[in-house]
Amino acid sequence: MHYLTPDLCDAYPDLIQVVEPMFSNFGGRDSFGGQIVTLKCFEDNSRVREQVELDGKGKVLVVDGGGSLRCALLGDMLADKAAKNGWEGMLIYGCIRDVDVIAQTDLGVQALASHPKKTEKRGIGELNVPVTFGGVTFRPGEYLYADNNGVIISPSTLTMPE
């Protein structure tokens, strides 16, 4: 499904919250949306790997990486796995790498920046807990919509106006 966040903002002004404009679009999908699954991890993408191996149909993985700009929480192999397992997209409060390959992957990906270094693997991270960044709190089960205009969240599913 193709989403236009300005149209959703106009149609649902009382339902949406707009995430502060700090993310860049890196994925092969310019527009994505779905039910939020949250993950809080700092400079360790072990739990990201676990999540992308699961069925992600209709879901968006929101990763709170603490805003770290010191390593990448997502690379081409995990992005490919997420796409193959049906994930709609990922919003990463941190960095990614392998950006040229990810740009060709059928997955929405927004992140702060790119960084060539991989993370440590310590198996640390909290799944499906509320995470706060960009001026909003992302809650598991709520909905996220993203495109080149920005990122919005809503407590319920939104449909594009006609």
From Swiss-Prot:
Q: What's the EC number here?
A: 4.1.3.17, 4.1.1.112
What does the cofactor field's note say? Divalent metal cation.
Q: Which UniProt keywords apply?
A: Lyase, Metal-binding
The coenzyme or cofactor needed here is:
a divalent metal cation
Residues binding substrate, per UniProt: 75-78, 97
Give the enzyme class.
lyase
The answer to keyword Lyase applying to this record is yes
Superkingdom per UniProt = Bacteria
Q: Does the keyword Signal apply?
A: no
Q: Which GO terms describe its molecular function?
A: 4-hydroxy-4-methyl-2-oxoglutarate aldolase activity; metal ion binding; oxaloacetate decarboxylase activity; ribonuclease inhibitor activity
Annotated function: Catalyzes the aldol cleavage of 4-hydroxy-4-methyl-2-oxoglutarate (HMG) into 2 molecules of pyruvate. Also contains a secondary oxaloacetate (OAA) decarboxylase activity due to the common pyruvate enolate transition state formed following C-C bond cleavage in the retro-aldol and decarboxylation reactions.
Quaternary organization = Homotrimer.
**Could you identify this protein by its name?**
Putative 4-hydroxy-4-methyl-2-oxoglutarate aldolase
**What is the species listed in this Swiss-Prot or TrEMBL entry?**
Pseudomonas syringae pv. syringae (strain B728a)
